[in-house]
């Protein structure tokens, strides 16, 4: 083997090591010019020098080292030539390892002495561990991971941390959303074949069966060809049947029937409708075609009708946003699908209002929007609702409109009988006298898709009551508030009804987002209890978290007798409900709906709506109760505010939320005692009565994440008194339930990113601390009698009087890195050989990343002080915060690599004869003990750092 001169380190004769029996068996000079320090006893002085022979091949992976007292180890001298206040982004090229093939051509026949040295190296490897098996891992410590790996030790990120940066931005192929359309995988496009029509899907399936080796470009062409025949403005969910029964046939009261539609899962999604044209042809109405598969009635007002329909759809779609739940997984974004502008409605004959006034004739032949259906005076119009809509639900004061004003705005009345964009069945209303026939037909109807029976029962229950005159504005059901009712019986029953409705709606959602709960203060139908009972039996988990105060038989029985039956012969149906004698504790009847954003919907008796006992709406009665509405609404908001304040932690970071509790409640029967909160006691002492404890405890609606909260601008225009409560100050988020207290302080984009990076790096630091302790325990177990400790006297900067989380993290990282360096020095002494060069390089880069974070933190403080000195309000610059977050991210990566290097060093140091079971058991006990201590510390103070509690 060729011997090179002039590129070696001095070779001292370690007399001190000979005395202690720790003389190295062989010297490992390497190709690096800088030496890595090895600790020895304080009293030993090294005078000899290792040989200047450089070994090629496997020996070229090792650096030369100089022994030094371990008590005087200085990080600044050990890892970087710069001072502690300076750093360099460049890395010495000598730190990198030479590959195996570098000197492959220069190898010559080695001498006998060199052969003996090589044999001793191999013997030492066999005696002292699995070093040969770790070469692949150790040499790749400094390389980036091929796949995006989370920096959290447990592998999962907290649910309230959402980063705007991908885990590994160097590999965009792993992030399909960052690629262009042409570079994305083909599989993500093939799954969209469910959007084709019958003919397209079948043809494509046959083609792929014949030839499964299509190229990606051919697949793209096939998909593009299929999409060219689509009209993107059309409805994406058409009925699967083309007969008359799948159309919305609005008929007279005597022949009203409930019809339900079946919607396909994959196919038949673009089959054109034929029921509308058939019905219109049979009715004798002149029609004409426009667009693609669209029809309209001929007449003078045909263009006007089309315009009205489009305006109505725009109004209707305003309340169909923020939807992230769909029954069919094929439709990733169901809220993008527009409603069917050609909904199948038959022409309604001229009707008369309850007071004898003819209905406005301008919308008689409107085939796009069916405005309302008139009932006799003793019945109520049942408005069709969509239970899966998720709207912002805060009551808006209903203006008092006369019949003339209503006739002008009638075209904008929301008809919720339109085809739902979720693939659910429409909700069809029917009068009480035909309900028995409808129920009988439903039981013998054609089987529907899964859970269809449940949706039938929901259809019959989730219909809100309005006046028989048809007075209804274009507002969702959460805007319908009630008027004062002079009869106490319906309000005693309303608690049961609202509770049941909230359960049904929450169960139908299947997620944390609850839907709109229509107020059923007065109905004229009886639900099909068999269907509801059957669903409860088949899906017991949906109702497992709810608690009723009476048995299941009485539950179904009470549901069957909903209040508001106006026929004299049906008054006896109230007995089973009124016998329950469910009354409010303080005279109020405030039903709380578990809304998506946790906002309270007050429907107490002081609110106003069409009177449920009389079929006539008196527009002059509303102002009589307006004062009571405002006063009692704000009182309930005050009381609910105290409940939400109890879910804020009392120490550390004020933005951390306790997610094990809830802040919303479905209604007043599921509310807990709010007086346990100190803030609520302060609010209650201002003259507002406190509610007593309710028997059902807290609600099951979980607390939403902070990024799901509604903005101030979205709320201010929905409620007229909101600006009076909160003033003109804007803010970026709302608490789940709000009152007069100002909302919480939220983070901006850079601050949020900094918070996420801090959490990641702190997690890596804790993991490094655990692994270092496990390493010490393993070494002490396998080398009894040896001094294996990471204790050192390396100077570490002290914290300031008011340190931030970044300052604490910097000090903790420096302290832990010094301990790891000391422990690695002990490992080299135990194994009598140097460790791999990548291990020392990983430690060098870790220290360098810490110095960079120190510099970024210093720049942030200096820039903030300069802005304050110039008279600018003290605020953080986004650039400084982003730079600090980027530096912390790099330090997190370096910490993870140090963990890998420590583990590799331990595996190379442990003797081969060590029993794995003897090592694993004490390590596991140590980890479990440390986890318990860490959990107890976090439970007392979430933001308390482990570095402050440990005794160093």
UniProtKB/Swiss-Prot annotation:
Pfam families: MEIOC
InterPro entries: MEIOC (IPR027963)
Bias kind Basic and acidic residues: ranges: 617-627
Location(s), subcellular: Cytoplasm; Nucleus
Keyword S-adenosyl-L-methionine: no
GO terms of biological process kind: chromosome organization involved in meiotic cell cycle; double-strand break repair; female meiosis I; germline cell cycle switching, mitotic to meiotic cell cycle; male meiosis I; metaphase chromosome alignment; mRNA stabilization; oocyte development
Listed Polar residues bias regions: 936-952
Tissue expr: Expressed in fetal ovaries. Expressed in testis.
A GO cellular-component term linked to this record: nucleus
UniProt key word Cell wall biogenesis/degradation: no
Region ranges (Disordered): 1-23, 609-629, 933-952
PANTHER family: MEIOSIS-SPECIFIC COILED-COIL DOMAIN-CONTAINING PROTEIN MEIOC, PROTEIN CBG18333
Its job: Is required for meiosis completion in both male and female germ cells. Confers stability to numerous meiotic mRNAs in gonads allowing proper initiation and progression into meiosis prophase I. The function may involve YTHDC2 and is independent of induction by retinoic acid (RA). Maintains an extended meiotic prophase I by properly promoting the transition from a mitotic to a meiotic cell cycle program by binding transcripts through its interaction with YTHDC2 that regulate the mitotic cell cycle.
Subunit structure: Interacts with YTHDC2; binds transcript that regulate the mitotic cell cycle inhibiting progression into metaphase, thereby allowing meiotic prophase to proceed normally. Interacts with RBM46.
Protein's recorded name: Meiosis-specific coiled-coil domain-containing protein MEIOC
Organism: Homo sapiens (Human)
Annotated gene: MEIOC
């Amino acid at each position: 083997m060729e011997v090179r001169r002039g590129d070696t380190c001095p070779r001292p004769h370690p007399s001190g090591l000979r005395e202690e029996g720790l003389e190295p068996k062989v010297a490992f000079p390497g190709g690096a010019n800088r030496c890595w320090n090895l600790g020895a006893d304080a009293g030993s002085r090294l005078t000899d020098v290792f040989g200047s022979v450089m070994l090629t091949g496997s020996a070229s992976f090792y650096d030369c080292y100089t022994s030094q007292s371990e008590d005087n180890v200085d990080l600044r001298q050990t890892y970087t030539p710069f001072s502690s206040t300076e750093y360099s982004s460049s890395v010495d090229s000598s730190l990198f390892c030479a590959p195996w093939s570098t000197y492959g051509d220069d190898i010559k026949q080695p001498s006998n002495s060199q052969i003996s040295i090589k044999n001793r190296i191999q013997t030492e490897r066999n005696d002292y561990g699995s070093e040969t098996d770790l070469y692949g891992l150790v040499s790749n410590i400094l390389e980036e991971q091929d796949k995006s790996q989370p920096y959290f030790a447990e592998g999962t990120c907290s649910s309230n941390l959402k980063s705007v940066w991908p885990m590994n931005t160097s590999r965009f192929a792993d992030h399909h959303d960052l690629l262009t359309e042409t570079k994305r995988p083909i599989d993500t496009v093939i799954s969209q074949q469910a959007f084709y029509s019958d003919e397209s899907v079948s043809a494509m399936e046959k083609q792929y069966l014949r030839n499964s080796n299509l190229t990606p470009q051919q697949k793209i062409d096939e998909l593009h060809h299929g999409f060219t025949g689509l009209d993107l403005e059309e409805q994406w969910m058409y009925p699967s049947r083309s007969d008359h029964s799948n159309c919305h046939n609005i008929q007279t009261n005597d022949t009203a029937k409930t019809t339900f539609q079946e919607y396909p899962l994959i196919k038949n999604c673009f089959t054109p409708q034929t029921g509308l044209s058939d019905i219109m042809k049979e009715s004798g109405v002149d029609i004409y075609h426009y667009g693609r598969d669209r029809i309209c009635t001929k007449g003078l007002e045909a263009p006007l009708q089309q315009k009205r329909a489009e305006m109505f759809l725009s109004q209707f779609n305003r309340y169909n946003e923020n939807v992230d739940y769909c029954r069919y997984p094929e439709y990733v974004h169901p809220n993008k699908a527009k409603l069917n502008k050609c909904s199948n409605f038959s022409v309604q004959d001229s009707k008369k209002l309850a007071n004898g006034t003819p209905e406005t004739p301008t919308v008689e032949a409107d085939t796009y929007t069916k405005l309302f259906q008139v009932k006799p005076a003793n019945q109520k119009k049942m408005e069709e609702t969509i239970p899966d809509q998720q709207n912002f639900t805060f009551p808006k004061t209903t203006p008092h409109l006369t019949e003339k004003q209503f006739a002008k705005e009638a075209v904008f009345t929301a008809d919720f009988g339109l085809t739902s964009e979720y693939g659910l069945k429409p909700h069809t209303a029917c009068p009480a006298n035909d309900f028995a026939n409808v129920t009988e037909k439903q039981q013998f109807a054609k089987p529907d898709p899964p859970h269809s029976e449940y949706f039938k029962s929901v259809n019959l229950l989730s219909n809100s009551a309005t006046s028989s005159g048809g007075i209804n504005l274009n507002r969702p059901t959460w805007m319908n508030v009630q008027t004062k009712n002079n009869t106490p019986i319906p309000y005693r029953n309303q608690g049961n009804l609202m509770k049941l409705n909230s359960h049904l709606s929450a169960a139908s959602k299947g997620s944390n987002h609850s839907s709109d709960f229509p107020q059923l203060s007065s109905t004229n139908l009886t639900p099909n209890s068999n269907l509801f009972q059957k669903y409860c039996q088949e899906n017991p988990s949906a109702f497992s978290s709810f608690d009723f105060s009476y048995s299941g038989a009485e539950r179904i029985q009470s549901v069957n007798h909903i209040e508001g039956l106006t026929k004299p012969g049906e008054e006896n149906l109230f007995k089973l409900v009124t016998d329950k004698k469910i009354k409010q504790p303080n005279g109020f009847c405030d039903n709380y709906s578990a809304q998506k954003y946790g906002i309270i919907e007050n429907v107490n008796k002081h609110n106003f709506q069409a009177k449920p006992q009389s079929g006539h709406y008196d527009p002059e009665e509303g102002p009589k109760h307006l004062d009571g509405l405002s006063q009692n609404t704000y009182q309930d908001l005050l009381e609910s505010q105290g409940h939400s304040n109890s879910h804020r932690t009392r120490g550390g970071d004020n933005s951390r939320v306790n997610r094990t509790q809830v802040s919303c409640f479905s209604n007043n029967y599921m509310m807990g005692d709010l007086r346990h909160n100190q803030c609520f006691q302060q609010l209650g002492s201002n003259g507002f009565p406190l509610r007593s404890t309710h028997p059902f405890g807290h609600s099951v609606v979980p607390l939403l994440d902070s990024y799901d909260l509604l903005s101030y601008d979205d709320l201010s225009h929905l409620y007229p008194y909101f600006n009076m409560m909160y003033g003109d100050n804007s803010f970026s988020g709302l608490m789940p339930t709000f009152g007069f207290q100002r909302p919480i302080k939220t983070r901006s984009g850079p601050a949020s990113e900094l918070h996420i990076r801090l959490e990641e790096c702190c997690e890596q630091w804790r993991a490094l601390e655990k692994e270092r302790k496990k390493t010490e325990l393993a070494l002490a177990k396998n080398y009894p009698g040896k001094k294996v400790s990471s204790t050192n006297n390396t100077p570490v900067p002290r914290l300031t009087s008011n340190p931030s989380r970044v300052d604490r993290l910097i000090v903790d990282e420096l302290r832990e890195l010094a301990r790891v360096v000391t422990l690695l020095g002990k490992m080299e002494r135990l194994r009598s050989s140097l460790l791999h060069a990548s291990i020392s390089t990983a430690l060098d880069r870790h220290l360098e990343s810490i110095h960079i974070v120190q510099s970024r933190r210093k720049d942030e403080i200096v820039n903030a002080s300069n802005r304050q000195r110039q008279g600018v309000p003290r605020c953080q610059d986004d650039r400084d915060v982003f730079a600090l977050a980027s530096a912390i991210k790099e330090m997190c990566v370096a910490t993870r690599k140090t963990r890998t290097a420590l583990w590799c060093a331990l595996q190379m140091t442990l003797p081969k004869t060590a029993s794995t079971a003897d090592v694993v058991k004490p390590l596991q006990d140590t980890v479990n003990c440390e986890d318990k201590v860490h959990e107890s510390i976090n439970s007392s103070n979430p933001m308390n750092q482990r570095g402050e509690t440990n005794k160093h």
